Amino acid sequence: MSSDEEYRESPILPKDSDHGSSVSSDLQDEYDELLRYAVVTPRFGPHFPEQNQLFTEQIKSDRFSSPKDPVQEQSLARNYSEENIPECSATSTSQRRSPPTANEEERAMSEKKSFLSGLEAFSPLHSEDLSLGGSTSSGSQVQQVRVKELPVPAENMDKVEDVLDLWSGTLKTNVMAELSKWRLTVIEQHKLEIKNQNEKHAEQISQLSSQIDKLQDHLQTYETSIQRKDEVISNLTHALEKHKEKMELMRTFTHWRLQLTEAREEDYARSLADRHYRNTLMKNAWKAWHSVIQSNWKDKIEQACRARAEEVCIELSNDYESKLTQLNSALGEARAEVQRLLAERGQFEGSMKKAFMRGVCALNMEAMSMFQGRESRMEYDPPPRREERDPSPSVTFQNPPVTSTHTSSTQHELQSALHSPVTCEPNYIHAFGPSTVSQSKEEAGAPAVISAATSASSVLSTQKLPMPRVVTSCQQKAGKIITARISARPDVSQRSSKIGSNITSMAVSPPISSIVVEKHHPVTQQTISQAAAAKYPRSALQSANSVGGRSTGQSGRVSQSHAGIHSIKVVD
């Protein structure tokens, strides 16, 4: 910092009249002692001591207070002189009554001088003011106060001198001590101020350095930004120049392209005009040619179409006639076949009626014989085995309904059965077979089946022969099986007459060898042990051993006398 600032900011020195300091208190005490010995109190009126005391107190207060203006001091002296005036006037009136002498006037002047000298000990200012006041009062011809002479001894003056010497010495020492203290305090304050200023200076330097660094950073950033801006400006100017060049090129290209399109449009319009002109000429020429050749061309086309249509019609008529003849011949054949089939159906229906009646009669006879001799017969002949029977052709007949369509179908089946061999039906169905035990409900509702086995050499007669019958408890529960065996000798005359009359009747209506009728009741569910016991009872096993030989003889005789066995099976 500069020297001017240090001078302005110098510390303020303490006042010499501060209360509580050592110098001021010592001086005050010495000053009081001086007033005791040096001040001579004149003998005034009763009010003068109080006024003098007040005046001295004001002087003391003025010493300890701040210095006042000279105008105020003069006003105080005037007030003091005016207050003393009435007392002086009172004394003067008393003296006028007695005229003064010259000695008395000299005494008064000496007292006045001593008074003024005593006042000068207090303060030269006040003494001057009083002298001025006295002069003014003398000038105004006011009588002065008569003060009696105050004698001061020499001892007191010596004491005052000693006291003043002591006071001046102590004042000097105290003033020097205070000055040294002030100097030290000033130096310390100056050092502290310098230290604070150095710290502030260092802080300011650091702040300024940081600001300088920041400003340098900002400067660098501004420089880089300015460089970038310059680059951007240069790039933009370069781009603008290129864009201007491009725009110029585009402008020239568009002008050239517009000229080219205009030229092409003119060429195209010219070509269209030429094409239109040619088309109009061609249309006119075609109309003229068409009007000339239209009549001849139409006639020729009509003749050609008519000829082609006639040829097609002739071909179609020939084809249809050939197809019609073929269909007529086929229709005649079909009608002849229908007539033949109808005749065959009539014959078949007659033979079926005869066979059905024979079966019904045999069934009735067997049923009557079964119910009559059921309890009397205990033994029976066992039926022959399946292996001993000779295979013979068999025909299966199905009971036809009454309608004509089914009769024709059954007649056709009979013809096919005559020409094709089928398996032989056995003459006897064993009573203990599994069919009697586990037959289903569908078999219970099946229609009647008639099986016939014929031979070309012999025809059995209608003579009834005795036949064995077996009825078991199982058969009585599950269903009823009626086995009928009819044996007859061949009747040659009857066979020859039937062969000569009709082959179909001979094949269909031979004498019946055996009829098997089954009447099934609802099937009962049995266990395996019950079915085995029902299949092989004890009575059947015992009778099979006793009748084995006789059955073999009978089977041999039957095989000799019978060429075939016919069986009818009726299922209710």
UniProtKB/Swiss-Prot annotation:
GO biological process entries: centriole elongation; eye photoreceptor cell development; negative regulation of centriole elongation
GO cellular component: centriole; centrosome; cytoplasm; photoreceptor connecting cilium
Ranges of Basic and acidic residues composition bias in the record: 375-391
Coiled-coil residue windows: 187-251, 317-353
Bias kind Polar residues: ranges: 89-101, 395-418, 542-562
Centrin-binding (CBR) repeat windows: 143-174, 232-263, 264-296
InterPro entries (UniProt xref): POC5
Main location class: cytoplasm
Key words of the record: Cell cycle, Coiled coil, Cytoplasm, Cytoskeleton, Repeat
Region feature Disordered, mapped onto this chain: 1-27, 44-111, 375-419, 542-572
Localisation: Cytoplasm, Cytoskeleton, Microtubule organizing center, Centrosome; Cytoplasm, Cytoskeleton, Microtubule organizing center, Centrosome, Centriole
Family: Belongs to the POC5 family.
Role: Essential for the assembly of the distal half of centrioles, required for centriole elongation. Acts as a negative regulator of centriole elongation.
Protein's name in the database: Centrosomal protein POC5
Organism this protein belongs to: Xenopus laevis
Lineage of the organism: Eukaryota, Metazoa, Chordata, Craniata, Vertebrata
Gene assigned in the entry: poc5
